[in-house]
């Protein structure tokens, strides 16, 4: 029978000092011997996805103590990628993921906590906490802050849906008036919550459902809706149940590594492909798998991308649907249900509810259940009220969207494409692979050949795009922006958005060893591995080189002879594979991150051979 980890600091005369300190935190005599459950919050006023989380930790804590646990809350940092975007702040975004994972480990192990409830929401916070949960392997429940309502405004007598990316694109479009640009800016992000499309934050929160580590609805129920409160309350109750099963019944099936198995990672990646999720999820799943000691690699992603269809298109891949529409269509359980019926899901993987994912689908998929409470839950909709307050409204759609032919979520028979929403490409310029979100690529450019125009940094690329250097037919190459070369692997949302602003969204490709925001669409290929700073061939591309991209056949090639490539490699070996004439201040903390960082195909985790 496993002993409570917290007994290390609460039992025996030698721990009198520790107990005295625990008492000073509010613990009573009868609390010693109960599981101490860490409530890992991420409240901050810097991030709209986290601005409403201040009271969520204590909401969960009260429920934990109601059912027999002792709750102790602490906070992690949280970076807003949208606010950090387009300047030096973005260098810190991806490194913050690993810092979050480490900080959770430090707090939980230093204080010998028995279990965790992870309250996350935005881009690097959910992955960081996920890495920590799989590293620590103690009972854990994830509950997120929930998606933002879609922005809405009236243009040309039509109501249109908006998000952050629309504000960025229109703000840089010289043909859009100041008044219209400001109108869009003011309307794009109306409430608290993670940005309203299938960007990185929402993608990752959806994936925790597929991994089995969060409750149904976690990825899709709006931050503003009263129903989300029930998810927080249920998380508090469920973590106590998991503690009892593990510490009192020796049931190891409730542990994160028992739930997030290789098959569960396959399910999560299949979900991401089916819903056209962010390419960042690839990076984070690879990193999480390493923490779980699961052999999940780019080869698995390639395998799945060839068989899983694209069942849902959500902003930024279309402006018709946002996360509020995914929820109305049955949420993640509905997409997993369609994958299951298509024979593309491992239905025997386990969840924190003690069910198999197949049993959970049977209970929560609106196509399978007639339970009125389940249908009511998935009718939860937006109120259209500007607010930073959680649980403010109880608006509901009249009906759920169960149209699997033309609705937000499709069946395999009526899929947007049979080829999935993400693809891994490989070739001489990306020997270890690169990633493209095919759900966001126009069919006319699935095959593309163009001349390279090379930039040594994101900043130079932005200047080149807005300055008219980039023309139709170009392949924009942005290099030395990988985990090591940045350092920090910046997101390239501004370059991709500005290509659209300049009318080049369907006329150019973009290739980088950096990464993309979940808000990116278009022929945007990232995670090029090995990265330039690690000796990847993207580091030897020259202006005018022809790059051929063939998404249907999963190929990307630099059309330069082997002899010429050998000469260029030798030249870069002498130069140390560093960007030419880049002016960038890099702090000591970022230099340390860059020194240990691996390329994107390894999840940009630390290189353990250097330790």
UniProtKB/Swiss-Prot annotation:
Subunit structure: Homodimer.
UniProt-listed Enzyme Commission number(s): 4.2.1.9
UniProt function note: Functions in the biosynthesis of branched-chain amino acids. Catalyzes the dehydration of (2R,3R)-2,3-dihydroxy-3-methylpentanoate (2,3-dihydroxy-3-methylvalerate) into 2-oxo-3-methylpentanoate (2-oxo-3-methylvalerate) and of (2R)-2,3-dihydroxy-3-methylbutanoate (2,3-dihydroxyisovalerate) into 2-oxo-3-methylbutanoate (2-oxoisovalerate), the penultimate precursor to L-isoleucine and L-valine, respectively.
Cofactor note: Binds 1 [2Fe-2S] cluster per subunit. This cluster acts as a Lewis acid cofactor.
Organism of this sequence: Histophilus somni (strain 129Pt)
Known pathway: Amino-acid biosynthesis; L-isoleucine biosynthesis; L-isoleucine from 2-oxobutanoate: step 3/4; Amino-acid biosynthesis; L-valine biosynthesis; L-valine from pyruvate: step 3/4
Similarity remark: Belongs to the IlvD/Edd family.
Binding, [2Fe-2S] cluster: 122, 195
First-level EC class: lyase
Gene Ontology biological-process entries: isoleucine biosynthetic process; L-valine biosynthetic process
PANTHER family: D-XYLONATE DEHYDRATASE, D-XYLONATE DEHYDRATASE YAGF-RELATED
Database matches in NCBIfam families: ilvD, PRK12448.1
Catalysed reactions, as listed in the record: (2R)-2,3-dihydroxy-3-methylbutanoate = 3-methyl-2-oxobutanoate + H2O; (2R,3R)-2,3-dihydroxy-3-methylpentanoate = (S)-3-methyl-2-oxopentanoate + H2O
Listed name of the protein: Dihydroxy-acid dehydratase
Superkingdom to which the source organism belongs: Bacteria
GO molecular function annotations of the record: 2 iron, 2 sulfur cluster binding; dihydroxy-acid dehydratase activity; magnesium ion binding
Catalytic residue list: 517
Pfam family of the protein (one): ILV_EDD_C
Keywords: 2Fe-2S, Amino-acid biosynthesis, Branched-chain amino acid biosynthesis, Iron, Iron-sulfur, Lyase, Magnesium, Metal-binding
Binding residues for Mg(2+): 81, 123-124, 491
Cofactor dependence: [2Fe-2S] cluster; Mg(2+)
One GO CC term, this protein: cytosol
